[in-house]
Curated annotation (Swiss-Prot):
Location of the active site: C76 (proton donor), C226 (proton acceptor)
Similarity comment: Belongs to the diaminopimelate epimerase family.
Pathway listed: Amino-acid biosynthesis; L-lysine biosynthesis via DAP pathway; DL-2,6-diaminopimelate from LL-2,6-diaminopimelate: step 1/1
Record's subcellular location: Cytoplasm
Name by which UniProt lists this protein: Diaminopimelate epimerase
Assembly notes: Homodimer.
Record has Ribonucleoprotein as a keyword: no
Catalytic activity from the UniProt record: (2S,6S)-2,6-diaminopimelate = meso-2,6-diaminopimelate
GN (gene name): dapF
EC number: 5.1.1.7
Length: 284
């Protein structure tokens, strides 16, 4: 029977199965299938997906993300924080600031260490993009969608489209508890206007420095947290004139809080926790 070692980790409840591909070398042709297997709460471990920690030619490590439906994602903020914690605590890297390769490009992570353990991680998530071609989204490639009415058949909502290396559409409401994740999340995620799908965020603005946030993730559904989504929500709030750059913005997610800062140099910084749940052996 084939088996591999794994570590289950979470960032604010957004939990993945982490596999060190430098040791395990799971076969490429079976990665999607394995991701579905390990993610199952009935016949697997139970998770939002699987993240591989791989060798890289351009950075100390490369991160690959597989959602619980087997699709491969391009970026994951909570996953990046957990990868940073893993590689530092397993002495794959020794510097406290280092780069991680993703399908969206290189990102820089800084681990905050206390008693030899990483308790917080700051990740430079890069520059947001707003053009439809960056999402991608149907329409004029160079045009943007900022607080524009979008027709989803059963309803029309004003949305702001932001790419943080993966696609996000942000909607605002007055009460986050009324966010229609179950009903509208799957409809919007797979709507024709988003050829590659989209992450769906609902946001309640409390103040210039505080947001409430809920998410329906592309390929995973409702999750406790989404780091790139929190970045998209903060950036969207600023471009919609409800907050300012160079301000620490606390984003309250279902699983806890992230601190987001959109800097004057256009880079978005995300700071939050990363936790190890357990280690184990998975039998295929």
């Amino acid at each position: 029977m084939t088996s591999f070692q794994f570590t289950k980790m979470h960032g604010l409840g957004n939990n993945y199965i982490y596999v060190n591909q430098m040791k395990e070398q799971l076969p490429e042709e079976k990665l999607s299938e394995i991701a579905i297997q390990v993610s199952s709460i009935y016949t697997g471990i139970g998770s939002d997906g699987m993240i591989l920690i791989c060798p890289s030619d351009v950075a100390p490590v490369k991160m690959r993300i597989f959602n619980n439906d087997g699709s491969e994602g391009k970026n994951c903020g909570n996953g990046l924080r957990c990868v940073a914690k893993y590689v530092y605590e397993h002495q794959i890297v020794t510097d406290t600031t280092f780069q991680i390769e993703t399908l969206s490009g290189l990102v820089e992570a800084t681990v905050h260490v206390q008693d030899d353990h990483v308790h917080l991680v700051t990740v430079d998530m890069g520059k947001p993009r707003f053009e439809k071609e960056a999402m991608p989204m149907l329409g004029e490639p160079a045009s943007t969608t900022i607080n524009e009415p979008l027709d989803f058949g059963t309803t029309t909502l004003n949305g702001t489209a932001v790419s943080m290396g993966n696609p996000h559409i942000v909607f605002y409401l007055e009460d986050i508890e009324k966010a229609p994740l179950d009903t509208l999340g799957p409809i919007i995620e797979k709507h024709d206007m988003f050829p590659e799908g989209v992450n769906v965020e609902f946001v309640e603005v409390v103040s210039e420095t505080e947001l409430h946030f809920r998410v329906w993730e592309r390929g995973s559904g409702i999750t406790q947290a989404c780091g790139t989504g929190a970045c998209a929500a903060a950036v969207s709030t600023i471009v919609n004139g409800q907050a300012k750059k160079e301000t620490d913005m606390t984003v309250h997610l279902a699983g806890g809080d992230l601190i987001i800062r959109w800097k004057d140099n256009e880079h978005v910084l995300m700071t939050g926790p990363a936790e190890t749940i357990c280690d184990g052996t998975f039998y295929l």
